């Protein structure tokens, strides 16, 4: 069957790094990845993401911590290169041939110590980047911000999840009717 719509809610359209890291660091690391693809590098993701989710820490979800570790594993340079190359295409602007809903939190934070921001904002991606590059896409694109949403919107608190699903199903009903 053909794809008739798409829902994007973990839009990794850019690395959430400083301007210097974006201009020099990521391209340099990506270039190294061309020649040393298996070399591993720290992910640089916020350490509070898994604790914000897991029941044994601050979250409400029970999942296997061997599969989603408390501390992020290192990533291969080939992974960084692949993401960076794909992001360059997104940055130019892409055409999506099916109706697309891009949903994201209303704010980004980067807590250095535990606080509730980890459960009420995106601590992995910069939502301004998501919006910026989603607006460069052409086709039938709709953007939707979710107040107090986490990075993974469907793992947010129950009231936020209800809003996510309400918006998603309203959009699907409208697009599919």
Task: Explain the meaning of each model-derived region.
Residues 1-75:
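Alpha/beta-hydrolase-fold enzymes
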Residues 93-97, 136-138:
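Short, conserved loop/helix-junction motifs that constitute active-site signature segments
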Residues 138-177:
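Catalytic active-site module of serine/aspartate enzymes centered on a nucleophile-bearing elbow/loop
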Residues 96, 102-104, 110:
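Short beta-strand/loop motif that positions the catalytic acidic residue
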Residues 71-93:
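Active-site nucleophile elbow and catalytic-triad environment of alpha/beta-hydrolase enzymes
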Residues 106-145:
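Conserved loop-alpha-helix segment in the C-terminal half of the alpha/beta-hydrolase fold
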Residues 6, 102, 143-145:
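Conserved beta-strand scaffold positions in the cores of enzyme catalytic domains, especially
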